[in-house]
């Protein structure tokens, strides 16, 4: 009985001393599909700024493309007729470039998340089709011009 206990103790020590083999790391989503298509996700300003580091790390590891969740929508990037706010959009593009992630464009103007001035004049009346087309042209040219070749 004493020999069995010694044998078991020796086996336990031997097994404890053996380190487990390093398991093979699972391939990332972007690596699995790299020869077929980009794997993308939307990013919000908190993630881009590094305030949600867990999400940012998942994006860096698994995704080959990003798109702005909201920071490039007209309401955010062009809040007033003569004022643009590119800070958050610039950060998103810089994050993609710094991490080798393709930045994908999104709808520049749509029915939702567009500033009120885009559709209505200072009297609260709908702008004319001509004025609306000019707002659209100016907005599109400004945003596309700023990020040309980067998105």
Annotated model-derived regions:
Residues 1-29:
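Bacterial Sec-dependent N-terminal signal peptides
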Residues 3, 38, 102:
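Residues at the starts of beta-strands that form the adenosine-phosphate
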Residues 13, 43-44, 99:
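Short alpha-helical scaffold segments that flank and stabilize functional sites
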Residues 23-55, 59-65, 69:
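Boundary/entry segment of secreted carbohydrate-active catalytic domains
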Residues 24-27, 84, 127:
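Short coil/turn linker and secondary-structure boundary residues
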Residues 43-53, 74-87:
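Acidic-and-aromatic substrate-binding clefts and catalytic sites of carbohydrate-active enzymes
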Residues 65-79, 88-151:
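Substrate-binding cleft and catalytic face of glycoside hydrolase catalytic domains
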